[in-house]
Regions:
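Glycine-rich phosphate/pyrophosphate-binding beta-alpha loops
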Residues: 1-8, 116, 128-139, 202-210
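Alpha-helical support elements that line or immediately flank enzyme active sites
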Residues: 16-19, 203-225
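Internal maturation/activation junctions in enzymes
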Residues: 20-131, 143-144, 151, 158-161, ...
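Short, small/polar residue-rich loop motifs at catalytic or cofactor-binding pockets
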Residues: 109-112, 134, 183-185, 275
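Extended C-terminal subregions enriched in glycine
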Residues: 121, 179-180, 213-214, 222-271
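Active-site rim segments in enzyme catalytic domains, especially the processed small/beta chain
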Residues: 123-193, 223, 227
Length: 306
């Protein structure tokens, strides 16, 4: 998904950085693996706060951000043994730097919905949509039965300062008439080498969406998990600021201890991270769906017409 969503750009950017390491050899959710995920997330979200906005109003440097050479340079900055400090992370694209005051950010709204669907003819849809806050603006359209959103909060009303959920943005995401606000939505469809769809996924979760989708892709493609295993696996999240790792129950005590020794600050997530809805096409052509149990009301349905 292109700007003004930041999802597609930074999903590709992070995968480009990570492809330079043998992640599978490190072991899923090992300290070495999580360290590299976190350092990659840290740099991508620093770029997000500075460079992303509505491309109709601001020249978003998409080509530079997803360039493999740029990813390789970011990878070289990562010490495999020691955590970086977010305060020390500088913008990577010097030629398009924009001034922005750095402030603490907290995970944004989780009032977002995602669904994935796949029919017998091979048509695939991965759809994410949101009202922003719970019940959006709290105003419904008379006799129409739907709520109006409050997406204005996704703008940087004052660049360099946090919005209602603590996310910091820059000049690129400032308010202007007719402009679209920045989001983290990352509806994703993956194609195999034969250019056939093999995976549809996405999730709600505000600023955690991009990292959730990335971990779903790594779980399925890198670690050969089935779609149910990939969905159930514990997740982590880092978003540059605040400088700590959010993690779900299930992360091993050994991994947490090693990460702390490396200098990371761990913050037990007060809630589960996202609620992915995914469909995976097996090599034999069968479709396997997985609805995330992190949120109530999820479901996976398969229907066959006579």
């Amino acid at each position: 998904m292109p700007p003004p969503s930041s999802g597609g750009v930074h999903l590709v950017q992070m995968l480009n950085i990570l492809e330079g390491w043998d992640l599978k050899g490190m072991g899923h959710n090992s300290a070495a693996y999580i360290h590299r995920l976190v350092e990659t997330m840290r740099r991508a979200y620093a770029d997000r706060s500075l460079y992303l906005g509505d491309p109709d109003f601001f020249p978003v440097p998409v080509a530079q951000l997803i360039d493999k050479g740029y990813a390789a340079n970011l990878r070289k900055q990562i010490n495999p043994e020691t955590s970086s400090r977010s305060a020390d992370i500088q913008p990577g694209l010097r030629e398009v730097d924009r001034p922005v005051e750095r402030s603490q950010q907290q995970p944004e709204s989780t009032e977002t919905t995602h669904f994935s669907t796949w029919d017998r003819w091979g048509n695939v849809v991965s759809n994410t949509y949101t009202l922003n806050f719970s019940y959006g603006s709290g105003i419904s359209v008379a006799s129409a039965g739907f709520l109006l959103n409050n997406e204005m909060d996704d703008f940087s009303s004052k660049p360099g300062f946090p919005n209602g959920y603590g996310l910091v943005g820059g000049i690129a995401n400032g308010i202007q008439p007719g402009k679209r606000p920045l989001s983290s939505m990352t509806p994703t469809i993956v194609f195999n080498a034969e250019d056939e769809p093999m995976l549809a996924t996405g999730s709600p979760g505000g600023s955690t969406i991009i990292t959730i989708v990335m971990q779903m892709l790594l779980n399925v493609i890198e670690f050969d998990m089935n779609i149910a295993e990939a969905t159930r696996a514990p997740r982590i999240h880092h978003q540059w600021l605040p400088d700590n790792i959010y993690y779900e129950p299930g992360l091993s005590e050994d991994s947490k201890a090693v990460l702390r020794d490396m200098g990371h600050i761990l913050n037990d997530s007060t809630g589960r991270l996202g609620a992915s809805q995914s469909i995976h096409r097996h090599i034999d052509g069968r479709l396997h769906g997985a609805a995330d149990s992190r949120r109530h009301g999820a479901g996976a349905v398969a229907a066959e017409s006579p």
